[in-house]
UniProtKB/Swiss-Prot annotation:
Keyword Zinc attached: yes
Phosphoserine found at: S317, S319
Protein name: E3 ubiquitin-protein ligase Praja-1
Keywords: Metal-binding, Phosphoprotein, Transferase, Ubl conjugation, Ubl conjugation pathway, Zinc, Zinc-finger
Cross-referenced InterPro entries: Znf_RING, Znf_RING/FYVE/PHD
Conditions for induction: By fear memory. Differential induction of isoforms.
Native organism: Mus musculus (Mouse)
Amino acid sequence: MSHQERIASQRRTTAEVPMHRSTANQSKRSRSPFASTRRRWDDSESSGASLAVESEDYSRYPPREYRASGSRRGLAYGHIDTVVARDSEEEGAGPVDRLPVRGKAGKFKDDPEKGARSSRFTSVNHDAKEECGKVESPPAARCSARRAELSKQNGSSASQISSAEGRAAAKGNNSLERERQNLPARPSRAPVSICGGGENTPKSAEEPVVRPKVRNVATPNCMKPKVFFDTDDDDDVPHSTSRWRDAADAEEAHAEGLARRGRGEAASSSEPRYAEDQDARSEQAKADKVPRRRRTMADPDFWAYTDDYYRYYEEDSDSDKEWMAALRRKYRSREQPQSSSGESWELLPGKEELERQQAGAGSLASAGSNGSGYPEEVQDPSLQEEEQASLEEGEIPWLRYNENESSSEGDNESTHELIQPGMFMLDGNNNLEDDSSVSEDLEVDWSLFDGFADGLGVAEAISYVDPQFLTYMALEERLAQAMETALAHLESLAVDVEVANPPASKESIDALPEILVTEDHGAVGQEMCCPICCSEYVKGEVATELPCHHYFHKPCVSIWLQKSGTCPVCRCMFPPPL
C-alpha cells in the first residue's frame, strides 16, 4: 500500500469513527472578544468551554486593538487538545474534525451513533475556524497557511502532499516525545498541564495507520490548569508585560519605602500624593536624624556636608550603598587637607575649651554650607599668644600636656603619683623613707641622667623620658647595692658547723681578768658600750678583756665563750693556741 493510499484510508476511517470528548461541565472565564459558544452532545449550548480556539489564551499574537483595550494578560486555562487541533490544521494534516480519541496503542473507541454527532461537531469546528481566521495568526501559522495557498495555486502535486505529510508525521513524533517530558510541542503563550484520562484498550494486530498528531483529551476531573506569566520575548510586542511588571515594581517600592522609613532612611524616589504626607515624612526624617547628628558633633564639618547628603538622598539609585559610598568618598577627600593641617606640633586644649571651639566651628560651617568652599579650623592668633604667654619660662609644652592629662584622670591614677621621682628614697641603711620626712636633705643620683641629658639640661632630658622609668632605674640601683651588702654579711656569718671553734673551757673563762668600772673611768678601753649587749658601762659593773684587747661585760662574754671559743668582734680563738 502506497503512502497516498494510506492517507486516504486514514481520512475515511477518521470520518467514520465518532468523536468521544468529555464535556467540561465547569465554565472557564474567557477573555477573548469572540464568542466561545459550542454545542454539546445533547443539543444544548454552553459558553466558555475548552473548544474556543479563538480564545486569547491560545492566540500567540492577539489583535492589537484588543491588546490595547486594557485587559490584563498572563493567565491561561484550557485543554491541550484545542491547541493540537489548530496545529494539525495549520500544518496541513487535515481538517479539525479528524481528531479522534486515541487509546493505548492506536485503537479508536467506537460509538453506535456515528453520523449526526460527527457532522454537528464538524460544523461547530468550522464556525470556530472562520472566527479564528479573523485573529492575527502567529508567524508559524502564517507561514504554513502561505505555503498551503501557494501549493493550491500551483496545483500541489502528490509528491508535495506526501512530503508535507511526512514532515507532519515527524513533527507529531517530536510532539509526542516532548509530551512525555511535560513539554509542549509548540512554545505557546500560556502552556497548560496535560493529563490523560479514560481507559486504554490493548493494541490489536490491525494494520498501523500514519497519524500526524493524536493526543489524549483531558477529562474535567483531572484538568488542572496552571497559571503562567506572559514572558513575551518577541520584539514586535514591547509592552505585553508592562502592566504586571509595573504593579510588581510599585509593590516592591512601597515595601522598601516602609522599611526605609522604619530606620529613618526612606528613599523618596517618587513624590507623595499629598502635601501633608510629604511634610510629615520630612518631619519624621528630621526627628530620626537628630541622635545621629548629636553623635557626630565631634566632627565640626558635619553640617557643611548636609547639602551633599540630601542631594544624594533625593537621587533615585538602585541601592543605598551607592550614594552612601559616594558620600563617604566626597567627605574623606575634603577631610584630608584638614587632617594634614592638624598634624603640626601644638598644644592640645582642654575638654571644655575643645567643645566650645567645636560648637563655634559647627555654627560657622552650617552658616556657610550654601557656598562652594568649606571653612577650615583655624585657631585664633590671639588665643595662641595667650597660651604662649601662660607658659612659664623654660616650660616645655609636652610636660604641660602630661600634667593636664594626669590631673584629669583624677583619683583613678593615684598610684601614678606615688611613684614620681623623689617620692621615695633610700636612707643610708637601705631603708625606704617617705620624701616628706627628709625633704631637707633630699639626695638624688643625678648621674643616672647623664646618658639622657647630653648637654641639654636635666629638665629637658626628663621631659623626653618617662618619670616612672627614671624612678625605677634609681630604685633598682639602690636595691642592687643593698643586696650586695647583705650577701657579704651573710657570707661572713655563714660558719660551717664541722669547722666551728669549740666552746672555751670553764677554767679559761674564770681566769679572765675582772675590771671594776669606777667614776674615774668613763670608758673602758676607749669603748663606751659593750659590743654584745650594746649598753654603756655603768659605775660598779664588772668588765673583762680578751687577749685580742676587746672589752666586754664579764657576764656577757662568759655566756658567749661557753658557746663559741672566739672573740665576738674579731673572731680570734680563745684561749689562743699555744
